[in-house]
Amino acid sequence: MLKATGPLSIILLASTCPSSGAAPLSFAEFNNFARECAPSVAPSTLAAIAQVESRFDPLAVHDNTTGETLHWQNQAQATQVVMDRLEARHSLDVGLMQINSRNFSVLGLTPDGALQPCTSLSVAANLLGSRYAGGNTADDEQLSLRRAISAYNTGDFTHGFANGYVRKVETAAQQLVPPLTARPKDDREKPGSEETWDVWGAYKRRSPEGGAGGSSGPPPPPDEDNRKSEDDDQLLFDLNQGGPQ
């Protein structure tokens, strides 16, 4: 659930990004929307949040007043139902990144806009960016990112740790795996290790028992051999990014 406590300067890109028309979004669709509409935040970071919030469904709506979670295949129908429930003074979390309806006026959003994947991602990226303070070390940067994620859910830098939201996003980031695609025969025959889609990059840890480690606090520093991707310098912050190399 997106929480906003003050005006945000956002660029609504819905007019340039088509509606998905069906839910949920595929990895490729989500990645394209994220890179086009929220270029300041790594797609993997946004994907982990979207998995927790809507499971990549741009037409998902959670009615906090009734406790219902609603899904549509048709955006026009979804928009009408959202408008009807807002008229009845319901509190709703709307769209791909689950923007709360009480923030619509602050953000300059309409029900239709909140259901647009591009707009939802743009708003989410701007909120995260407004709460991300950075840091002097890689550990500081990662803790700052988690604090921004906490604020995204609760409007507070610490409550999202206490209620388990930050941990849920961490878990989603570790579990998200893109679909396997076929490689050319020549490529399959080449020796060497395979690359994986590791949203935690250099920060992937193991517990003493051998399971996946991880807490809501800052992870250990990265190995010096880890290399940044070409996109790293273009991202405001990234769960993939292990800090300066």
From Swiss-Prot:
One of its GO terms (biological process) is protein secretion by the type IV secretion system. Keywords: Crown gall tumor, Plasmid, Signal. Coiled coil: none annotated. Residues 183-193 have a biased composition (Basic and acidic residues). Belongs to the virb1 family. InterPro entries: Lysozyme-like_dom_sf, Transglycosylase_SLT_dom_1. Gene3D superfamilies: 1.10.530.10. Residues 1-28 form the signal peptide. GO terms for cellular component: type IV secretion system complex. It comes from the Bacteria. VirB proteins are suggested to act at the bacterial surface and there play an important role in directing T-DNA transfer to plant cells. Residues 176-245 are annotated as: Disordered. This is Protein virB1.
